C-alpha cells in the first residue's frame, strides 16, 4: 500500500499495476472481438453459438494477456493462501488440475511457486494446449507441468488435491456436469477453486465500469461459446454468486464459500 503525502487515502500499488496492464490488454481483446463479428452476428439471429475453436485466431492469446495481470498479482500471494490448507499441501507436493487452462498462464504461475507439486493443464482447444506446452518450456516449468487436450467433463484422474477453474466455468456448455466431474476427480479432502468474474446478484449491482466490460465481452464471446456446446447453459460472465453456488452444489459439493475477491474476480472454494 502507498499513502500520498497529506492524504488519508491509501492506494494499492498492485491494483494500479494490474489496471495499467489491463488497459493495454483490453485493446487486444476488443480487436479480437471485432474480427469475429461476421461469425457472431448470425448466432444472434438464429439463436446458435460460436465454437471457441472458431473464434478469431488472435482471441486465444488476447484472452491470455487479458487475465495474466490479475493472476500474476493475486494468484500465489492471495488466492491460494485463502483456501483451506491448500498451500501446505502444495509446498509438500500435491497433484493439481488446471481445467480450461488455455495458454497455461495460471498453470505456470502455480508451478513456479510450488516446484514440489505436479500441475496438469487441461483444455478442449488443441491449439491452446500446444501453445501452453511451448510457454512451459520457455519458462522452465516443464519438469512439473504437463498439458493435455480434455474437456471439463472427461479429463482423467480421481486423486487431485486441488482442481482449479480460472475464468472459464461460465463459458462451459454444461457447468453442472463439469462440477459433478470435478467432485469425482478430487481426493476426499480436496478443494475446487473457482475463479469467476466479479458480479453482484442483481443487475443494478453490476452497472459499473467492470460490469459493463464483462457484459460486453460476455455477449460477444462467453455466451456464444457456451451455446455452441452440449446443454448450452450460457451462464455468461456476469453470472451471479447465487447462480454459481447452485451449479456447484448441483454437482455434489456440500461446502461452498467465497474465499477471496478483487474488483475483477470472485474466488470460490468448494469442498465435497
Language-model-derived ranges and their functions:
Residues 2-94:
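Conserved Class I S-adenosyl-L-methionine-dependent methyltransferase catalytic core
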Residues 95-97, 109-153:
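Class I SAM-dependent methyltransferase SAM/SAH-binding core
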Residues 104-108:
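Glycine-rich SAM-binding Motif I of class I
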Residues 153-163:
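A short acidic, Gly/Pro-enriched loop at the edge of an enzyme's catalytic core
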Residues 161-175:
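A short SAM/SAH-binding and catalytic strip from SAM-dependent methyltransferases
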Residues 176-188:
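A short glycine-rich, Lys/Arg-flanked "PGG" loop and its adjoining helix->strand segment in the class I
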Residues 195-250, 257:
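C-terminal alpha-helical "lid/dimerization" subdomain adjacent to the S-adenosyl-L-methionine
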Residues 252-272:
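Core SAM-dependent methyltransferase catalytic element
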Amino acid at each position: 500500500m502507498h499513502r500520498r503525502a497529506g492524504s488519508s487515502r491509501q492506494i494499492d500499488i498492485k491494483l494500479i499495476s494490474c489496471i495499467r496492464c489491463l488497459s493495454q490488454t483490453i485493446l487486444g481483446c476488443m480487436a479480437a472481438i471485432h474480427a469475429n463479428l461476421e461469425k457472431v452476428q448470425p448466432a444472434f439471429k438464429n439463436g446458435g453459438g460460436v465454437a471457441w475453436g472458431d473464434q478469431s485466431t488472435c482471441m486465444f492469446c488476447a484472452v491470455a494477456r487479458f487475465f495474466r495481470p490479475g493472476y500474476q498479482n493475486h494468484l500465489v500471494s492471495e488466492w491460494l493462501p485463502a483456501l483451506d490448507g491448500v498451500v501446505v499441501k502444495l509446498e509438500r507436493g500435491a497433484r493439481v488440475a488446471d481445467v480450461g487452462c488455455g495458454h497455461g498462464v495460471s498453470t505456470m504461475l502455480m508451478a513456479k511457486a510450488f516446484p514440489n507439486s505436479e500441475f496438469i493443464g487441461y483444455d478442449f482447444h488443441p491449439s491452446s494446449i500446444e501453445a501452453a506446452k511451448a510457454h512451459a518450456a520457455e519458462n522452465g516449468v516443464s519438469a512439473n507441468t504437463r498439458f493435455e487436450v480434455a474437456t471439463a467433463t472427461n479429463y482423467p484422474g480421481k486423486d487431485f488435491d486441488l482442481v482449479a477453474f480460472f475464468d472459464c466455468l461460465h463459458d462451459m456448455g454444461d457447468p453442472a456436469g463439469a462440477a459433478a466431474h470435478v467432485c469425482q476427480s478430487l481426493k476426499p479432502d480436496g478443494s475446487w477453486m473457482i475463479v469467476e468474474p466479479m458480479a453482484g446478484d442483481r443487475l443494478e449491482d453490476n452497472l459499473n465500469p467492470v460490469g459493463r466490460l464483462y457484459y460486453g465481452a460476455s455477449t460477444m464471446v462467453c455466451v456464444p461459446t457456451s451455446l455452441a456446446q452440449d446443454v448450452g447453459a450460457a451462464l455468461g460472465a456476469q453470472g451471479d454468486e447465487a447462480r454459481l453456488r447452485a451449479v456447484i452444489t448441483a454437482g455434489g459439493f456440500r461446502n461452498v464459500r467465497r474465499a477471496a475477491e478483487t474488483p475483477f474476480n470472485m474466488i470460490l472454494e468448494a469442498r465435497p
